Amino acid sequence: MTKETEFEFVRLVGTERRKADTLAGVSRRWQGENERFLFISPHDDDVVLGGGLLIQLAQRENIPVHVIVVSDGSMGYCTEEQKENISEIRRQETYESFKALGVPAENIIWMGFPDSILSDSCGRKAAQSDDPKSIEGFVGLQNSFTKYIRQIAPTQCFLPTSSDLHPDHKVVHQEFLISLFHAAGNIWPELGSPIENVPYVHEMAVYCDFPEPPNLRMKTPESLLEKKLEAIAAFKSQQQIGSLIDIVRKSGPYEYLRALNFKLYQPAAYYDMFEKKHHIPFIR
């Protein structure tokens, strides 16, 4: 097998099947040297499970990769001994994991919100003076997301699917999407200058299936799959990690993405629906 055929990208656009051996070849409005990818990980291992191949593919095309880890991992202990220091254990495992995928430590952002209760951190509110999550005097998922979206100015973003059963994943999905629009507007100027363009957003399946079928398939050499498995295995404190490794290995060197499209409300789009020409007159 040649090097070219080891990498395959297939994007479905309506009835059209677009195929290439690079991400650029199948991507929408590729921005060349300006491309920057941002991965949103509700918990430290989510992005590795859902996008460990994609991260390596981005490195192959010299695309900077940034990762936001939203929660502090404090509820991820599997033994009594881990209970007091699991957050620090998982932080070190995260650095080891992303190092295996080629992501530099300085590109990993820790938001530090309490694990398993991210719903308590929705929105934005005035921060207590001693809150380490405070940014410009405020705290909350939308506050932090808006800050980092403006700081990084990504061209494409990747996060777990909205259909995941984990409440933290659902909250992150919702809060991140509205933060994209905050980041593009003039609201909260202390968090930085607005981004010029809202980035493209893609869903990754981590535990649950996509709400609708994905439209991008990525195939890599087995060597990239082995690197992904190595990165997953770095989370040694998570005793269930072995079963996840088995699932990923059996699935082979493939990952899938589903593009999200935002359709803003336009009242004029419904005008013709209510015109007489579309209906039979009602007779009493």
Regions found by a protein language model. Give the residues of each.
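Short, active-site-adjacent segments that bind or coordinate small-molecule cofactors and metal centers
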Residues: 242-284
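A short beta-turn/loop motif at secondary-structure boundaries
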Residues: 164, 193-195, 249
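A generic secondary-structure signal marking the coil-to-beta-strand transition
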Residues: 35-36, 107, 199-200, 216, ...
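Short, flexible loop segments at boundaries between secondary-structure elements
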Residues: 184-212
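Sparse recognition of residues in long alpha-helices and their boundaries
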Residues: 110, 192, 243-244
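Active-site beta-strand->loop->alpha-helix modules in alpha/beta enzyme cores, enriched
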Residues: 1-189, 274-283
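A conserved mid-domain beta-alpha-beta active-site/ligand-binding segment of alpha/beta enzyme cores
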Residues: 203-260
